[in-house]
Amino acid sequence: MSEHVYNLVKKHHSVRKFKNKPLSEDVVKKLVEAGQSASTSSFLQAYSIIGIDDEKIKENLREVSGQPYVVENGYLFVFVIDYYRHHLVDQHAETDMENAYGSTEGLLVGAIDAALVAENIAVTAEDMGYGIVFLGSLRNDVERVREILDLPDYVFPVFGMAVGEPADDENGAAKPRLPFDHVFHHNKYHADKETQYAQMADYDQTISEYYDQRTNGNRKETWSQQIEMFLGNKARLDMLEQLQKSGLIQR
């Protein structure tokens, strides 16, 4: 049995430095088609992909994200939850489907659809020799992103993805993930606190050593410290408001 795909995904790491070489239209089309082949709940296909090569639009999105590689890449994708076409079906059929796509379940379906599509694109791009980085930073200002991209009601930007040929001096590497036993629960969830704390202590040591080696001693924080810093940062607290402004989560 070939382990090509297994080895490919195990090597994944975010690439944040790209060569100044735009992706061809053919490559973009192949990536999108690969994304479309992802599983989709009840065949709703509740997503859309916005491809961006306009430098002014990229720059506007960079101002939202604060990250240079939103501009400096081979191509930029933005993935959105999309119930606009479903809304049009609803209007044409004169039914009341908004109870479904304006629900919390509808939000989950759209977000999962978009994520599955994006992961297909990521794996396909890496198989072609490109690097990718996901961009949750576009949610820093959802209202501005909706304005920049002319998003109608029932469409919500969830994340972006920069794709391109890695720069010659790009030196990223796969970070050690939580060990198998930490994330795989057999038959039922195992919530024993002592076990969980022991596992996290081991993983904290692994991550601290990883950063120490990667930075020649300049960085040594643990995974737990990163979590405390990230989740303790009161950011993007307007998500519910922005979702509701988009016509989602009405009930």
Curated annotation (Swiss-Prot):
Cofactors that this protein relies on: FMN
Any one GO molecular function term: oxidoreductase activity
Induction: By ethanol stress and disulfide stress.
EC number(s) on file: 1.6.-.-
Protein role: Reduces FMN, organic nitro compounds and disulfide DTNB. Involved in maintenance of the cellular redox state and the disulfide stress response.
PANTHER family: NADPH-DEPENDENT OXIDOREDUCTASE (PTHR43425:SF3), OXYGEN-INSENSITIVE NADPH NITROREDUCTASE (PTHR43425)
Family: Belongs to the flavin oxidoreductase frp family.
Protein name listed in UniProt: NADPH-dependent oxidoreductase
Organism: Staphylococcus aureus (strain NCTC 8325 / PS 47)
